[in-house]
Amino acid sequence: RLVSNQSSSEISSLFTNHLNNICPKSCKIKVTEHHGGEPCVVNTDTKGYRSAYKAFQDVWKKDPVPTFDGGSIPIVALFKKELSLDSILMGFGLDEDAIHSPNESYGLFNFYKGIETITCFYQNFAENEK
């Protein structure tokens, strides 16, 4: 997972070089570099972002806390680069859900609140003038 000032090809190359440098002489390694996704930071001054922010306020009765968090979703950076569109990523999971682990879980409360939030987002987006 990369941050906004990194490129996947550069990090892949640095990682490969590091592995080759620390590999004991008695071992042989082969690193195959695959495609990489670029990082992306979205603009928070958009109709979509404001609509999502308000949806979280309306449904959860609290202000959302934006974070520099995310996973590897290469299409987000591609949408921004090729279409000049800022994606809206709304998370409803918790740290305790242990995402991608053998015992991953996802609470029904958050599932249903997520559906409600997305519905509210669409309504806000349709009503938002700017």
Locations of regions flagged by a protein language model:
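Metal-dependent amide/peptide-bond hydrolase catalytic core
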Residues: 1-116, 126-130
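Short glycine/serine- and small hydrophobic-enriched flexible loop segments
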Residues: 120-123
